[in-house]
């Protein structure tokens, strides 16, 4: 923990330096503009967004008749720009009930550097294995695991690799990804391949992928995943189908997930989410499911934002039933605190105080 506070001190000092550097750059841009340089562009934002993210609450298991207060993790995130085209992103679990240490990469969910222009994005580092599912695509800290599929609860998604995304137009994105296989377990020469399409139209959003996850030399688990989101003003729903098999002839019959997840945004300060799914889990040693055979999972969640126009503080109440055959209730709070904004506010107050002396 001592090393963490040293690291956090370095981060805060870096933010302070970046704030000052940004001010100098902005002043230089204004001076150039005042000298009549019509070609001067706006100053780029190079101050990193550094934040901490956490969730805690009370959870009750009705099958076991046990309940307790607990936290779902404390995360540190850093995002920023190196240049107009290069950016970086970092998200690390500082502490959780199953943390294995502070500085090991096992607790780093993602650590990436990206190059992006109008038609291309190249990303390298540790990132999520691309899978066509909105349930899977969301932040862990925003998910209610007892409402989710066994696939979500079993898949080792954070892997080192690289991806290339192409933008044929404003509404479509095509992605190719190569990374370590989620079934490699640290062994070399086992890789995963993904081909994905994300579309964002006026009332429809898609996230489709075709995947191959290597588990032995020349042997792959194949997967097809189709996530579809339909938006109608304050109401939306996701319709998803995912299927997996080591033998291509079993692709649509042995191991699959089918789910529908509606969301109703009843006001600016709250929404209601639901989920109902049917999953068939084959007897497969690769996935280590918590349950074999067919079963249904479902749940409801209500989310509230007590501060107007501020979604970084969220209250929730959720109930779900999944592969553990229990009914679980969770009531809690999720919060995100921007260290960068705090430093900016401190610098601004100090500057104003000095100006008034």
Where is each model-derived feature located?
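Sec-dependent N-terminal signal peptides
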Residues: 4-13
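N-terminal signal peptide c-region/cleavage motif recognized by signal peptidases
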Residues: 16-18
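Beta-barrel outer-membrane channel/assembly domains of diderm bacteria
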Residues: 21-122, 164-174, 229-231, 263, ...
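Surface-exposed coil loops of outer-membrane beta-barrel proteins
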Residues: 23-25, 53-63, 99, 121-198, ...
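Detector for outer-membrane/organellar transmembrane beta-barrel domains
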Residues: 34-36, 41-48, 195-298
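Transmembrane beta-barrel strands of outer-membrane/channel proteins
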Residues: 52-58, 90-94, 124-126, 176-180, ...
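Gram-negative outer-membrane beta-barrel proteins
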Residues: 58-64, 96-100, 130-134, 170, ...
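Residues that define the transmembrane beta-barrel architecture of outer-membrane proteins
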Residues: 65-74, 104-109, 116-118, 156-160, ...
């Amino acid at each position: 923990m001592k090393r963490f506070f040293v690291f956090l001190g370095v981060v805060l000092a870096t933010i302070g330096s970046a704030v000052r550097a940004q001010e100098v750059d902005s002043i230089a841009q204004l001076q150039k503009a005042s000298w009549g340089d019509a070609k001067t562009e706006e100053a780029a934002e190079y101050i990193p967004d550094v934040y901490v993210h956490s969730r805690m609450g009370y959870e009750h298991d009705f099958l076991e008749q046990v309940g307790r207060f607990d936290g779902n993790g404390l995360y540190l995130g850093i995002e920023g720009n190196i240049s107009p085209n290069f950016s970086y992103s970092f998200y690390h679990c500082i502490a959780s009930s199953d943390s294995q240490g502070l500085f090991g990469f096992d607790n780093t969910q993602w650590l990436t550097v990206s190059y992006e222009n109008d038609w291309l994005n190249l990303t390298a580092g540790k990132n999520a294995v691309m899978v066509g599912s909105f349930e899977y695509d969301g932040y862990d800290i925003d998910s209610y695991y007892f409402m989710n599929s066994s696939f979500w609860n079993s898949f080792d998604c954070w892997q080192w690799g690289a991806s290339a995304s192409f933008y044929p137009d404003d509404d479509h994105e095509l992605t190719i990804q190569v990374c370590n296989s989620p079934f490699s377990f640290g062994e070399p020469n086992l890789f995963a391949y993904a081909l994905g399409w994300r579309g964002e139209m006026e009332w429809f959003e898609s996230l489709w992928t075709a995947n191959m996850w290597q588990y032995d030399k020349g042997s792959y688990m194949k997967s097809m995943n189709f996530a579809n989101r339909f938006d109608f003003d304050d109401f939306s729903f996701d319709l998803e189908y995912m299927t997996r098999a080591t033998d291509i002839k079993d692709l649509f019959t042995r191991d699959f997930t089918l789910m529908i997840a509606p969301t109703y945004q009843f006001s600016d300060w709250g929404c209601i989410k639901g989920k109902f799914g049917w999953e068939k889990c084959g007897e497969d040693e690769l996935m280590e499911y918590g349950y074999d055979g067919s079963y249904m999972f479902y749940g409801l969640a209500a989310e509230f934002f007590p501060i107007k126009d501020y979604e970084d503080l969220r209250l929730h109440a959720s109930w779900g039933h999944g592969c553990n055959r229990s009914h679980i209730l969770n009531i809690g709070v999720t919060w995100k605190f921007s260290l960068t904004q705090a430093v900016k506010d401190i610098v601004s107050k100090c500057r104003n105080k000095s100006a008034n002396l």
